[in-house]
């Protein structure tokens, strides 16, 4: 692997947002409008404080304890974290239980698979 020459070490963070699936397009648009186009999107299941929901299915009540969610991951420089978080919150919030959660995680390095270039 070759390490790219850097003028300065840039602290990077991964912003991980677990959101309602129907809010994905709004979140993508909000991020793109602010210049953040790279992201990884995964369909996931989970639960938080709401602990699932009860639904009617073929006349019977069914408890669903893991709900469909969408996970959006964006890696940005440390100084862009607040802008990314604000974009996600403002575009994904409904004000109801189940809106999701955002996590900010340190990233130690990034390696481009095609070239082997490493950023620290």
UniProtKB/Swiss-Prot annotation:
It is found in: Cytoplasm. GO terms for molecular function: ATP binding; enzyme regulator activity. One of its GO terms (biological process) is regulation of nitrogen utilization. 2-oxoglutarate binds at residues 48-52, 69, 98. SUPFAM superfamilies: GlnB-like (SSF54913). The keyword Nucleotide-binding applies. InterPro entries: N-reg_PII (IPR002187), N-reg_PII-like_a/b (IPR011322), N-reg_PII/ATP_PRibTrfase_C (IPR015867), N-reg_PII_CS (IPR017918). Activity is influenced by intracellular pools of the effector molecules ATP, ADP and 2-oxoglutarate. It senses the cellular nitrogen status through 2-oxoglutarate, and the energy level of the cell by binding both ATP and ADP with different affinities. ATP and 2-oxoglutarate prohibit binding to Amt3. ADP promotes the complex formation. ATP binds at residues 40, 48-50, 75, 98-101. GO terms for cellular component: cytosol. Transmembrane segments: none annotated. Involved in the regulation of nitrogen metabolism. Regulates the activity of its targets by protein-protein interaction in response to the nitrogen status of the cell. Regulates the activity of the ammonia channel Amt3 via direct interaction. Undergoes conformational changes upon binding of effector molecules. Belongs to the P(II) protein family. Homotrimer. Interacts and forms a complex with Amt3. PANTHER family: NITROGEN REGULATORY PROTEIN P-II (PTHR30115), NITROGEN REGULATORY PROTEIN P-II HOMOLOG (PTHR30115:SF11). This is Nitrogen regulatory protein GlnK3.
């Amino acid at each position: 692997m070759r390490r790219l020459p850097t003028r300065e070490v840039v602290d990077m963070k991964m912003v991980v947002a677990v959101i309602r699936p129907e809010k994905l397009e709004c979140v993508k648009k909000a991020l793109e409008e602010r210049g953040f186009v790279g992201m990884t999107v995964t369909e996931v299941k989970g639960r938080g404080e709401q602990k699932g929901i009860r639904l009617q299915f073929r006349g019977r009540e069914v408890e669903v304890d893991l709900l469909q969610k969408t996970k959006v991951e964006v890696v940005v420089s440390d100084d862009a974290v607040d802008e990314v978080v604000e974009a996600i919150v403002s575009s994904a919030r409904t004000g109801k239980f189940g809106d999701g959660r955002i996590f900010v995680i340190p990233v130690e390095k990034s390696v481009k698979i095609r070239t082997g270039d490493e950023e620290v």
